[in-house]
């Protein structure tokens, strides 16, 4: 982790990501043990619901023998973020934060002398994608050469998957209705990181999943829950078993969760043997343990 923080996957280079994968395998196999020494303290800030994220980091901190300091803090509301950072600097060894405002997390990191881990913001979900990438390494033996099709709107998860293309030789295709694409400014920023463009966008579901190693999807926007033009548009990219069959017999399916069966994916497709979503969620513990361990050892 080049900056000490993990705010996005752009903070990782290939050796660091490879190390995270190797450590995740060791933690999953029970081969790693928490380092002995001074007790570490990690503040956790979860703004809003965070069922799986809370469980993952709770398991990680417990595995490492780290004392968790849960805080109810809304950055920038009662005091400048710089003041909050100053207090945290003297009290804990790292901060895990999940909040919608990525700019607030970035500002916290700018004023922090300790590592900050982005547990999810509106701009990225790096820890989640690290865990899902680990699951693909388990299933496919590596990430180079893979084709990931993200079916859905421009979301934090879509962006984090795209950021992974700057580390490995994998391709990402976004499938979405017109008007819901990744912004050009984001794609241009990736192009600056890596000269070869590895992200494509299409509005055709069949074309987007053709030859995909994994189809990944996320929940639809709330505006699609009522009948109307937006729901009609998103129904054209609903994943069903026919979608999986057209993609290929070896194609895997992953979902961020929570899932709304009958919206972004049918119940039959989600429960299909090619769906590895629950397997990926079982990997949240070891991968998040590896993440926190790396950050603390660098911080």
Give each language-model segment a name.
Residues 104-121, 227-248, 273-274:
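A short, gly/pro- and small-residue-rich
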Residues 36-42, 144-146, 250:
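Phosphate-coordination loops involved in phosphoryl transfer and adenosine-cofactor binding
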Residues 35-137, 261:
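Phosphate/diphosphate ligand-binding glycine-rich loop within oxidoreductases
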Residues 191-268:
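Rossmann-like adenosine-cofactor binding region
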Residues 1-53, 124:
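Positively charged, low-complexity intrinsically disordered leader regions
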Residues 250-251, 256-299:
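Adenosine-phosphate binding glycine-rich loop
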Residues 47-62, 141-217:
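Glycine-rich phosphate/diphosphate-binding loop of Rossmann-like nucleotide-binding domains
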